[in-house]
Structure formats: C-alpha cells, structure tokens
C-alpha cells in the first residue's frame, strides 16, 4: 500500500517537529538533573524548618564528626581549660600544696623613747634583780680569787652594750667591795672616770660604804667630799653609818671633824630624816648621836 501524498507531508512535518523538540527536551532533562531543587524551590517553596541554615552558609552538621572523635575533642578542650585555670591559680598562689606563711604586716616603727636617767635605771635594775645577780656573780669570782675571770665578765657585760656603762662599772665596784678587794674597787672606779663616765650618787655611795665597812675611813671621807664636789650628796644611811664607823674607830671628835669638812663642801644634815632613821635602827650607838647633834642621847628633844 502506497501512502498518499497527504500522509507523506504529514509524516515529514512530524519528523521535522520531532527534530526541533528533541534538543529542548534533552536540555530540560539536563537542567533537571543539576538544578532540579532550585526549580522546585522557586515553584513550590518548602515549609520553614527550625534552625534551617540560610542559603550559601555551611551547615553545622555538614561535617559532623563521629561520636567517639567528638568525645575525644570535648575531653581535650576541657583539659586545656582546666590547665589554664590551674596555671592562673598557680600564679595567684591558690590551691598550692605548700603554702607560704603570710608575712606579718609591717608597721612604721615608732621613735624610741628618750633614755632614762641613770638613777632611775639603777632603781629598776635593783628592783628587777639584775644588779644583785651581776654583783653576786662578780662577788663570787672575786672571793674565789678569780679576779681575771671577774674582769672578763665585766668586759663581756660592757661589750653587750645593753646596760649603761655606769651601771656595769658600779656593779663591779660593789662586787670588789663585798669581796673586800678595796684596791681593785678603787681602781675600777678611777677607770670609769678616766673613760669619761661620770659616777652618780649611787656609784659614790657604793664605794664609800665599801670603804668604811673595811675601816678605810680616811678614804671614805675623801670620796664623800669628792662626791659633794661632783654635785651629789650621801643619803641618810651612808652618812649615819660613816659617822658611826668614825666614832667607833677614831672617836667622836674625829667624827665631828669629818662632819664639819662635809658641811664645808655643802652638805647639810637633814635633822628630821637622820632622827627617823636612827629611831628605826634603835638602839643606835649614842656616840654617833652625840657626834651628829653635839649632845648626849638623853638630851634629845622628844
């Protein structure tokens, strides 16, 4: 069967149409494979999802690591953080095993008080037992004939520098006097003066008492006169006991002569204080009373 001319023409037109439409269909198929999602989104936009990343941004889950690796990295970051914290604590000195003892706050030092008078120092040291103890040590050394050892102790006390030198010298003088080493006592006394240390009333009184207790009465009167010339006066016990020793050894007239010598040096007898002292020491030898008041004890106005 031979096709008609109309059929041939129709077939040619269909073939031509097929040749034209085939590339466009293939192109459409090509586009659909590469950008199909874009065409779909433009035509039918999807429903919004929570935390959906914007277009062009990398999703946080695009390179998700395995759970084991995530746990390892998490532990590593925590360790790094804790190490940094530890270093900061170490710098600040916190949580250390061996803590340093905190230093006490330093306050500005107050100025030292002015030095006390030597007489006041003597009084406090006698009350505290320091001078008696020093004298006892020196006295024991001197009585045992250990004068060199006593002088070494004396030098050691001086080198310490914590006690005024007049106190140390006087303690040595008193120790020698109690050991009846009067020449050594006088030598130390003169050494004190030669070194520029002025004896005080206590120093003179110690030496005068040591002298009249050893019956060295002329020296006792001489040092008592020197004491007055230096601006010091013997106290009542020293004066009365010196007069009593003079009366016992040399008689009343010699005692009265010594009193007159002291009066010429500026010594004034405190009658009331002397009477009170002698009454407390009663019965006191009448010769001393007579030498001081120039009258017999029976004539005393009580």
UniProtKB/Swiss-Prot annotation:
Keyword GTP-binding applies: no
PROSITE patterns tied to this protein: PPR (PS51375)
InterPro entries: Pentatricopeptide_rpt, TPR-like_helical_dom_sf
Bias-annotated ranges (Basic and acidic residues): 54-67
Organism domain of life: Eukaryota
PPR repeats: 130-164, 165-199, 200-234, 235-269
Region annotated Disordered, chain positions: 26-82, 94-116
Keyword terms: Repeat
Keyword Repeat: yes
Polar residues composition-biased segments: 26-40
A Pfam family reported for this protein in Swiss-Prot or TrEMBL: PPR
Record-stated family: Belongs to the PPR family. P subfamily.
Protein name: Pentatricopeptide repeat-containing protein At4g38150
Species this protein is from: Arabidopsis thaliana
């Amino acid at each position: 069967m031979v096709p008609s001319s109309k059929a041939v023409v129709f077939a040619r037109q269909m073939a031509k149409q097929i040749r034209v439409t085939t590339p466009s269909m293939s192109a459409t198929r090509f586009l659909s494979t590469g950008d199909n999602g874009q065409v779909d989104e433009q035509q039918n936009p999807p429903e919004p999802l929570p935390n959906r990343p914007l277009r062009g941004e990398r999703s946080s889950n695009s390179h998700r690591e395995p759970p084991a690796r995530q746990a390892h990295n998490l532990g590593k970051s925590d360790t790094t953080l804790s190490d940094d914290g530890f270093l900061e604590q170490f710098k600040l000195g916190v949580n250390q095993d061996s803590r340093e003892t905190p230093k006490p706050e330093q306050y500005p030092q107050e100025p030292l008080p002015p030095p006390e008078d030597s007489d006041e120092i003597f009084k406090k040291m006698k009350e505290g037992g320091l001078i008696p103890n020093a004298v006892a040590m020196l006295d024991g050394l001197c009585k045992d004939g250990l004068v060199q050892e006593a002088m070494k102790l004396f030098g050691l006390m001086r080198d310490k520098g914590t006690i005024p030198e007049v106190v140390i010298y006087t303690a040595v003088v008193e120790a020698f006097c109690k050991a009846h080493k009067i020449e050594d006592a006088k030598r130390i006394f003169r050494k004190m003066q030669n070194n520029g240390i002025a004896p005080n009333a206590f120093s003179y009184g110690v030496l005068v008492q040591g002298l009249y207790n050893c019956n060295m009465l002329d020296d006792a009167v001489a040092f008592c006169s020197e004491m007055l010339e230096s601006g010091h006066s013997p106290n009542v016990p020293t004066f009365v006991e010196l007069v009593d020793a003079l009366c016992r050894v040399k008689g009343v007239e010699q005692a009265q002569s010594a009193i007159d010598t002291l009066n010429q040096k500026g010594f004034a007898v405190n009658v009331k204080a002397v009477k009170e002292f002698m009454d407390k020491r009663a019965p006191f030898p009448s010769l001393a009373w007579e030498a001081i008041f120039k009258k017999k004890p029976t004539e005393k106005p009580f």
